[in-house]
C-alpha cells in the first residue's frame, strides 16, 4: 500500500455512504499516516458529512463532501464491501489509474484492482493498521484507528473481537 502511495501524486481516499466510526477512522487514519510519512503526496478524503461525534479526529475538517471532476493516480476505498457503497463518489473511482480496497466484510466482492480483505478482522481499521509501519504511527493516526476498532467491536463486546484486535487497540491507547 505504501509503495503504491509513494508512487502516486494525486491520491484519493474514501469510505462508504453514511460513514460510521470504522469508516471515518480508517479514512482519516490513512490520511494522517500519509500526510506524516509521505508529505510530498497530494491526499484528499471524500466522505458524506460524518457525525459531529468524530470532530476530535485530526483531519476531520479537511474532508470534502462532494466529488470533484479530476483524475486520480490512486483511489483507496476503505470499509466498503461493494461499489454501490461508494456513491456519490463513483466518478472519482472510475477516474483513477489504480484502485485499492481495504475492508473486513465477508460480503466484499473484490471490486478494486487490489483488494486487502480480511473477514476475520474486527474492522477496516484493524486491516489498515497491518499495512502500516508501526514505528511511523503517531497519536493522530492512533486515535483514528482506535475509534474505528471501538465502533465496530461495540467496545470489544462483539464476537469479531480477537486477541489481535485487543493488541492493536492497546498499542493505540499507549500513544495517547
Where are the model-predicted features located?
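Active-site cofactor/cluster-binding pocket
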Residues: 58-114
Amino acid at each position: 500500500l505504501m509503495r503504491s502511495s509513494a508512487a502516486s501524486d494525486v491520491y484519493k481516499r474514501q469510505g462508504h455512504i453514511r460513514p460510521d466510526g470504522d469508516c471515518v477512522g480508517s479514512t482519516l487514519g490513512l490520511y494522517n499516516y500519509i500526510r506524516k510519512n509521505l508529505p510530498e503526496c497530494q491526499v484528499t478524503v471524500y466522505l458524506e458529512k460524518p457525525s459531529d461525534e468524530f470532530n476530535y479526529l485530526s483531519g476531520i475538517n479537511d474532508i470534502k463532501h462532494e466529488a470533484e471532476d479530476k483524475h486520480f493516480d490512486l483511489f483507496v476505498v476503505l470499509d466498503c464491501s461493494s461499489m454501490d457503497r461508494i456513491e456519490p463518489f463513483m466518478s472519482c473511482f472510475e477516474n483513477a489509474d489504480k484502485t485499492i480496497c481495504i475492508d473486513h466484510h465477508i460480503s466484499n466482492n473484490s471490486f478494486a484492482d487490489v483488494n486487502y480483505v480480511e473477514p476475520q478482522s474486527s474492522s477496516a481499521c484493524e486491516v489498515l493498521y497491518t499495512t502500516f509501519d508501526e514505528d511511523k504511527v503517531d497519536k493522530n493516526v492512533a486515535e483514528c484507528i482506535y475509534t474505528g476498532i471501538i465502533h465496530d467491536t461495540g467496545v470489544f463486546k462483539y464476537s469479531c473481537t480477537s486477541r489481535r484486535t485487543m493488541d492493536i487497540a492497546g498499542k493505540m491507547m499507549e500513544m495517547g
